Amino acid sequence: MERQGLDLGLSLGLGLTTAATWPAAGFCLNSGMAEQEVIRRDDVVAATAAEDERFACSPGSPVSSGSGKRGSGSGSGDEVDDAGCDVGGGGARKKLRLSKDQAAVLEECFKTHHTLTPKQKVALAKSLNLRPRQVEVWFQNRRARTKLKQTEVDCEHLKRWCDQLADDNRRLHKELAELRALKATPTPPAAAPPLTTLTMCLSCKRVANAGVPSPAAAIFPGHPQFLCGFRDHAGAASSSYGGASSGLAKAVRAAR
């Protein structure tokens, strides 16, 4: 009985001991795995950094393309960046001067296509004895200059249009102020109709209304006295002519 109890106690003690030692062993195992993971991760980071540096130094990499794009804004059309890169950071960038023939061929190609496919880029670089990267940089510079010129033209056009709109706005404001001033001033009263003028006929001794002319005045409106005198003279002449004719008739009868 005592032996069984001793064995049971021993087994229980061993079980507790092993149970107590398992977390420590697991912790040590986890620590070792974590250290190995950290070391492995550092190796991967170092290898990735080295690969990135080599990739950045290659002529056709996007990183060097971006650096060429940043440096291309101040370059002329006949210069391209000859991207030379040193892993240690001591490399200097130099510019390659293009000949007139090379620049002319590139300009003609740019008139046809503003962007080139990789095959076109390689073929054009081979025909001009250049590297594909140099052709790519030249096209990037040319597109940037074209966009800048178009922006300047658009800005000048918008500036003129803005000045014209400002002049029209000032003119409309002036016309509106004049219309408001005319509306605010009181209107003068309506003018009275002209008075009717009367003229005196000296021969007829009658008062004639100048607004309603007589038939004789309608024929000769400017000579009322002449008409009256003409009528008087005509009457006198007719009476004298009639008297003379009657006397002549009497003399003829007496002779008979």
From Swiss-Prot:
Q: Where is this region: Leucine-zipper?
A: 149-193
Q: An example Gene Ontology cellular component term from the record?
A: nucleus
Write one Pfam family the protein is assigned to.
HALZ
Which tissues does it occur in?
A: Expressed in seedlings, roots, stems and panicles.
From the UniProt entry, list the residue stretches annotated as the region Disordered: 56-86
Q: Which UniProt keywords are listed?
A: DNA-binding, Homeobox, Nucleus, Transcription, Transcription regulation
InterPro entries given for it? Answer: HD, HD-ZIP_Homeobox_LZ_Class_II, Homeobox_CS, Homeodomain-like_sf, Leu_zip_homeo
Spans through the membrane: none
A molecular function (GO) term: DNA-binding transcription factor activity, RNA polymerase II-specific
Location in the cell:
Nucleus
Gene3D superfamilies named among the record's database cross-references: Homeodomain-like
Q: Which residues bind DNA?
A: 91-150
Task: Specify residue ranges for compositional bias: Low complexity.
Answer: 58-67
Q: Which family does it belong to?
A: Belongs to the HD-ZIP homeobox family. Class II subfamily.
Q: Tell me, what does this protein do in biology?
A: Probable transcription factor.
What is the protein's name according to its record?
Homeobox-leucine zipper protein HOX28
Q: Which gene encodes it?
A: HOX28
